Regions:
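N-terminal export/targeting leaders of redox proteins
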Residues: 1-53, 73, 84-89, 108-201
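Short amphipathic alpha-helical surface micro-motifs
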Residues: 44-45, 80-81, 101
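The canonical Cys-X-X-Cys-His
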Residues: 59-68, 95-105, 189
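N-terminal, post-signal-peptide region of Sec/Tat-exported proteins
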Residues: 57-91
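Short, well-structured alpha-helical interface segments that form or flank functional binding sites
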Residues: 47, 59, 93-96, 184
């Protein structure tokens, strides 16, 4: 009887030790895997944002996202003719409103006035200006509600589907397109957000 009890006791002890060992192995595996997973997410996030930035710094976006009071024009980013100004609401000065030339559709002639609904610059209260910024500075500006029109990251996704933003992929004759399609751009934006919205240094 004593031998049976001893064997049973030994069996229970062995099982307990094996269970404990297995638990320790799992904990160590999780501890070693977590930093790697976080690092991989950060790397994916940074790669995605670099692609997002390639669109945001193309002439179709950059010409209106300027720190100065007047927009730019063309693929060479030259100052807008007629001394156009941002105005108090981003839609031009009182004397020369944007809609005076920019209608809801592009003009059919080469380099004619482009058009889309709500044609305007970002207003002075939230100029969303990133011309001249590094990729990291652009990233942090885009995430900052005080600089991005008081938008959350999810709001940015919605904003990128507006007719004015979509115009960049239908800019009219004589203007180059952004380096990604609109679908690719939005996909990279979502990927950047879903993987932590990491910013380059």
């Amino acid at each position: 009887m004593n031998l049976r009890i001893l064997r049973a006791s030994l069996f229970v002890t062995v099982i307990s030790l094996l269970t404990l060992s297995f638990g320790l192995v799992q904990l160590r595996a999780r501890a070693s895997a977590s930093p790697q997973t976080d690092q991989e997410s950060a790397e994916k996030s940074l790669r995605a944002f670099h692609e997002v930035a390639s669109v945001l710094t193309s002439p179709r976006c950059l010409n209106c996202h300027v720190p100065d009071d007047g927009p730019l024009q063309g693929d060479d980013d030259h100052p807008h003719i007629m001394n156009v100004k941002r105005g108090a609401d981003g839609k031009g000065s009182a004397a020369l409103r944007c809609f005076a030339c920019h209608q809801t559709q592009n003009a059919a002639v080469l380099h004619g006035p482009p058009g889309a609904l709500e044609w305007q610059l970002p207003p002075p209260r939230a100029p969303m200006a990133w011309k001249g910024l590094s990729t990291g500075e652009l990233c942090r500006t885009l995430k900052d509600p005080s600089k991005n029109g008081n938008r959350s990251l999810q709001d940015l996704i919605v904003h990128m589907d507006t007719s004015l933003v979509r115009w960049a992929w239908n800019p009219g004759p004589g203007r180059t397109l952004p380096p990604l399609s609109h679908d690719e751009f939005v996909s990279r934006l979502k990927e950047w957000i879903d993987t932590g919205a990491a910013c380059p240094n």
